[in-house]
């Protein structure tokens, strides 16, 4: 994603608490507007790439732990924590999106509590991954438990992110006016800069790209499905 500018947040009269949530984010990429939900899903793209690293690492850990870099897994976990858990989940979803969706009611309102519980479980698993990989060499003693932890995180977050992308985020956007979309956009931009610094998204993309390269996962063509005939 190219560097994206967001307009400054101006709280509208009468928009308080969870109602601020119902503001969306519109960004400009060149002359093209990018919606808040699209931006949230782009952030999910970074996290999905981290989950793919985890899933591939789990396979290798079960066959030959020496082929898995503990340092690469630690860097992935640190990225997942900083970009996913501390920024995307806590500062955007839990602070703004989930309260608004619950307040709006409807089908989507039953998801925020479940999603928040899964966020917490994910943080516990990230704690474990960081503890195992920090300055350690992976071997037969820690490889299988780590593989199980990685697999459980991937299994949880795949349907988790899919429900957010297809149910929760669209429900959030549906209750927004165009003005509210503009207002929340800059609030999210302020949060991103405060939490991650300038070019936070682009930095996250570079980090996960470097990790993929380190683990031999950078070439997309290698994952093209083969058909048995």
Kindly give the residue locations of the regions a language model identified.
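Small-residue-biased structural context
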Residues: 1-229
